[in-house]
């Protein structure tokens, strides 16, 4: 609903700049406005927000593992059945039981990162009701302290504390990067429509010129100043431009539909893009760009995370292959009684210790093989990440160098466009005066059209490189500030 209101507001503001006869359902968008809409309403932007929220709550879950947790449990049960009961003399006898067991337990637990174990504190009460004779009794655990620990095992808490902060930092950087890529994609859609509309304008202009020249040539042919072949060539030019105009209209419709879909515009609104001729004139310090990319890019954080994950896998494989030992110990105070008060009087000591050991004697090299596989995977990851880092560095350098050249290319393309238009006008006048051939005229038309298209492409290349460089470095070189987002607003 908000996206529709925003688009209709833009539509209202844009349409007020046109006469009523020409403004029906026409939305004029600049590149800046296009990017603003795309960052709010495009499918890529919405997916990025949901992805970040998922990573955020995953990080919250990770942090909660290192905080105390308080849990209440109760498992009341009713039993009316015949069960074997051991008598004082050691014999067993089937006895009908009709009883109700109710309990309540409160447990406070805390994971210990350094050891990977867990410390817990419990307090609970049980009540047993014998329904046949209407008697009851209580059992209490006033306080119970316990600890469980896997000795020589894999410490997942320690490795998670190394990996998860890096993963969340990567998620934050990835969101900023994705929004810059959304800007780059919006720029692509914008200039695709700009190119299509430029081609349509070219086709309309060329058709009008071809129609005028063909009409003029008919008169010259009637008085014998041009050959039939030349007049037929002009007729072919006219028909070709008419066909080009129809094809260009189809391209405009297709690009406009794609453009609307990406911006989240569901209404059948005609859009006209307003391409600004000027581009910001500034150069990027290549060394600074490379340094910022290594600090800010999520690619670098991802490399670090994957290395840590591979080392964690090796540690887990080693722990699984060797000696395993688990210890469980609890100490507390307990008592029973026929009344609740008596169940808390003179509590008795309660101790319980359990140690479990597992050592593989014969596994046919399975444990060793798991370790070797994990080590090979780790070495492969380290090799791949070293290559990825080198490729990333080369990509940053290439994009920065290309961007620094692009403002000059835009100026050259603009000058070429103006010169080609002037040359076409001169060639047309010379042809009308009979001082030029149809071949020269056609060549000037082709050069004019190519120059206009090259100019639009040069503008697109500038902005594509601009947003690509921002996505690689997460830095705005125009304003000299780091790119960031209001992450708190994303999780609301």
Regions found by a protein language model. Name each.
Residues 162-166, 172-292, 402, 447-448, ...:
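Periplasmic alpha-helical coiled-coil/stalk elements that build and connect Gram-negative outer-membrane
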Residues 96-100, 137-139, 347-349, 450:
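Short sequence motifs at beta-strands and strand-loop junctions characteristic
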Residues 72-78, 121-127, 327-333:
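Transmembrane beta-barrel strands of outer-membrane/channel proteins
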Residues 36-46, 53-69, 105-137, 145-162, ...:
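A glycine-/polar-enriched beta->alpha junction
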Residues 18-24, 71, 80, 279, ...:
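Acidic, low-complexity, intrinsically disordered peripheral segments
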């Amino acid at each position: 609903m908000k996206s529709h209101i925003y688009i209709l507001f833009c539509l209202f503001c844009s349409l007020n700049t046109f006469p009523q006869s020409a403004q029906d359902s026409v939305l004029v968008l600049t590149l800046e406005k296009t990017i603003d809409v795309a960052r709010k309403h495009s499918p890529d932007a919405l997916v990025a927000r949901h992805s970040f929220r998922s990573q955020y709550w995953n990080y919250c879950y990770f942090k909660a593992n290192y905080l105390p947790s308080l849990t209440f449990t109760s498992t009341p049960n009713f039993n009316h059945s015949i069960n074997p009961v051991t008598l004082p003399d050691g014999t067993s006898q089937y006895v009908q039981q009709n009883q109700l067991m109710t309990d309540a337990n409160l447990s406070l637990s805390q994971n210990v990162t350094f050891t990977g174990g867990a410390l817990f504190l419990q307090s609970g009460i049980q009540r047993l009701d014998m329904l046949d004779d209407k008697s009851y009794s209580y059992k209490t655990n006033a306080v119970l302290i316990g600890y469980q620990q896997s000795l020589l095992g894999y410490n997942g808490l320690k490795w998670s504390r190394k990996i998860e902060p890096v993963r969340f930092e990567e998620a934050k950087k990835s969101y900023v990067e994705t929004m810059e890529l959304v800007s780059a994609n919006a720029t692509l859609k914008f200039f695709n429509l700009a190119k299509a509309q430029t081609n349509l304008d070219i086709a309309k202009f060329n058709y009008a010129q071809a129609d005028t020249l063909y009409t003029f040539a008919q008169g010259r042919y009637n008085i014998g100043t041009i050959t039939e072949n030349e007049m037929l060539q002009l007729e072919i030019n006219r028909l070709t431009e008419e066909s080009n105009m129809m094809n260009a209209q189809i391209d405009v419709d297709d690009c406009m539909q794609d453009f609307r879909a990406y911006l989240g515009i569901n209404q059948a609104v005609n859009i006209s893009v307003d391409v600004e001729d000027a581009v910001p004139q500034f150069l990027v310090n290549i060394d600074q760009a490379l340094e910022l990319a290594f600090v800010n890019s999520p690619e670098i954080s991802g490399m670090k995370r994957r290395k840590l994950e591979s080392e964690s896998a090796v540690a887990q494989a080693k722990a699984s292959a060797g000696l395993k030992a688990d210890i469980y110990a609890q100490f507390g105070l307990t008592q029973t009684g026929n009344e609740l008060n008596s169940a808390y009087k003179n509590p008795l000591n309660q101790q319980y210790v359990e140690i479990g050991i597992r050592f593989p004697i014969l596994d046919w090299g399975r444990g060793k093989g798991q370790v070797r596989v994990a080590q090979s995977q780790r070495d492969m990851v380290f090799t791949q990440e070293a290559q990825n880092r080198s490729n990333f560095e080369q990509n940053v350098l290439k994009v920065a160098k290309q961007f620094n050249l692009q403002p000059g290319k835009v100026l050259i393309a603009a000058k070429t466009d103006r010169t080609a238009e002037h040359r076409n006008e001169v060639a047309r006048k010379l042809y009308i005066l009979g001082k030029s051939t149809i071949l020269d005229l056609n060549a000037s038309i082709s050069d004019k059209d190519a120059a206009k298209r090259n100019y639009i492409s040069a503008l697109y290349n500038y902005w594509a490189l601009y947003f690509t460089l921002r996505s690689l470095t997460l830095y705005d070189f125009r304003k000299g500030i780091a790119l960031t987002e209001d992450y708190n607003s994303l999780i609301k």
